[in-house]
Amino acid sequence: MNIVFSKEVESALKHKRPVVALESTIITHGMPYPKNVEMALNVENIIRKQGAVPATIAIINGIIHVGLENDEINELAKLKDVIKTSKRDFGYVLANKKNGGTTVSGTVLVAQKVGIPVFATGGIGGVHRGAEITFDISRDLDELSTNNVLVVCAGAKLILDLGLTLEYLETKGVEVLGYNSDKLPAFYSSSSEFNVTYNVHSASEVAAIMKAKWKFTNGGIILANPIPEQYGLEYEYILDNINKAIEQAKVEGISGKKTTPYLLSKVLELTEGKSLEANIQLVYNNAKVAAQVAVEYAKQK
């Protein structure tokens, strides 16, 4: 398979320095231009300041890129024909030399293949509301269960059924570690009514858990990192707006891949931009923690 590494990432992997994988759908589908470029470059710099190397993963003209130069991020952010790429899409996107923004599951898949054990994102996908009828369950959860990658996130997106998402993760053997929290963060909000599997208190503790688990068995780990309080939105406030967005999606017949981008856009409108700022801040926070964990894991190896 043709995978191109940036010089920075190639050197880091060769010398076993800490690397943090980053998805690209947050650039291609998650935020408007030029906010997406600004956020992506800031995330990379946050990771570098913590002593790790950022590796944004994307598909450009049918070639998987692990690590992007600044001009490549800028070009990717402006493209209109980018395919949201999870495991099922790789064959089509690669064979037809298309452009792809890798989802959480797509990024986990590539990270595992190239040996990057830490990945930072905003929030994971999960079990959609009404999944008992629609069977709409994100590929993220299955990919996490089979690949040795730690995903640092602010929990699952609040547009999902958080309770069922946790149940599914338990079935798949994926632990959800709360970073200095007993409760699952709810993306825009720092807490929810749901409990995490274990509360952990430091990057070194997380790194030790990664090492111990993967010495014994395979499978991903979620580090649920709450959005800093000063940037978080009230749980009931954001939940109310999400419910309104979900009802509107039903009216407009939105389904499948289009659901998440539609709902995030609608929530942005309903919260008058507050959700976008919260989204950016939680991604920054996750990048910082992921880099700290990657540094500790590199020491323990």
Swiss-Prot record:
Substrate binds at residues 84, 104, 138-140. Its EC number is 4.2.1.70. One of its GO terms (molecular function) is pseudouridylate synthase activity. GO terms for cellular component: cytoplasm. Gene3D superfamilies: Indigoidine synthase domain. Binds 1 Mn(2+) ion per subunit. Coiled coil: none annotated. The keyword Iron does not apply. Mn(2+) binds at residue 136. GO terms for biological process: nucleobase catabolic process. Catalyzes the reversible cleavage of pseudouridine 5'-phosphate (PsiMP) to ribose 5-phosphate and uracil. Functions biologically in the cleavage direction, as part of a pseudouridine degradation pathway. This is Pseudouridine-5'-phosphate glycosidase.
